[in-house]
């Protein structure tokens, strides 16, 4: 049977996808109407976020491979939450720009680390089924996040960004308590033991 790690990764995939899609579904509208960015600033915000993701990909991968996949995922979730809270609570150009770096960095901490954590913790399980179910839960959470974000955004455009960020932080706190890491070996040990 499939165990606790399987259920926890389903929870993580569902809630994280819900929170991120809730925070981002109306981001262009939020940036235009609330933050009142002009066309150049909009392009700059997108470029900074993409650049942050690119630049942090290698250093954050090192954390995952050498120190802890669990730690990498948790750091990423807290950075997502902090970035979205900053973006939603401080609707001015400079904080919104900084928020893109923060949550873009958070994204790179999670990318790859989550899959590696699942694969190492569930190594005796049918991993294709584990990943498929995780992906399905992420898609369901993402769709629900779009619906909730749109409904909340009709009330107040800051609300879905702030609530999504808060949900990321709450998920991070829950995962600190329930996310095990029992099968991790630093990558440097794996490389040297093969020699």
Question: Which residues does each PLM region occupy?
Answer:
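Conserved small/polar residues in nucleotide/adenosyl-binding loops
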Residues: 1-9, 191-195
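Helix-loop boundary and gating motifs at the non-cytosolic
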Residues: 4-51
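Helix-loop junctions on the cytosolic side of multi-pass membrane transporters
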Residues: 175-188
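Transmembrane alpha-helix termini and helix-breaking/packing motifs in multi-pass membrane transporters
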Residues: 144-161
